[in-house]
């Protein structure tokens, strides 16, 4: 059981890193903040399509990561 959870955790970590790297950047960094990128801050645009799917998948994979970590720590006791 412990080995199965560790394998699931490794798969989840790889998937989480992949999904985060597939997402587009949402800001221009520090240069956008200095040169007046406030319209991006206050004029929030809705996410659609692939961006929305990747955002939700990131949240699900992150929650799964924490659940698996709690399971591993519980079984390790």
From Swiss-Prot:
Domain of life the protein comes from: Bacteria
Pfam families hit by this protein: SecG
Principal place of residence: membrane
Entry keyword Phosphoprotein: no
GO biological process: intracellular protein transmembrane transport; protein secretion; protein transport by the Sec complex
Compartments, record wording: Cell membrane
Residues spanning the membrane: 2-22, 57-77
GO molecular function: protein-transporting ATPase activity
GO cellular component: plasma membrane
Keyword DNA-binding: no
Bilayer topology term: Multi-pass membrane protein
Coiled coil regions in record: none
Keywords annotated in UniProt: Cell membrane, Membrane, Protein transport, Translocation, Transmembrane, Transmembrane helix, Transport
Functional note: Involved in protein export. Participates in an early event of protein translocation.
Record family assignment: Belongs to the SecG family.
Protein name: Probable protein-export membrane protein SecG
Organism the protein comes from: Staphylococcus epidermidis (strain ATCC 35984 / DSM 28319 / BCRC 17069 / CCUG 31568 / BM 3577 / RP62A)
Taxonomic lineage from the root: Bacteria, Bacillati, Bacillota, Bacilli, Bacillales
């Amino acid at each position: 059981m412990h080995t199965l959870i560790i394998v699931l955790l490794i798969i989840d970590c790889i998937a989480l890193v992949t999904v985060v790297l597939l997402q587009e950047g949402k800001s221009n960094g520090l240069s956008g903040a200095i040169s007046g990128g406030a319209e991006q801050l206050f004029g929030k645009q809705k996410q659609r399509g692939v961006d929305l799917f990747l955002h939700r998948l990131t949240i699900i994979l992150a929650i799964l990561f924490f659940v698996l970590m709690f399971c591993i720590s519980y079984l390790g006791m």
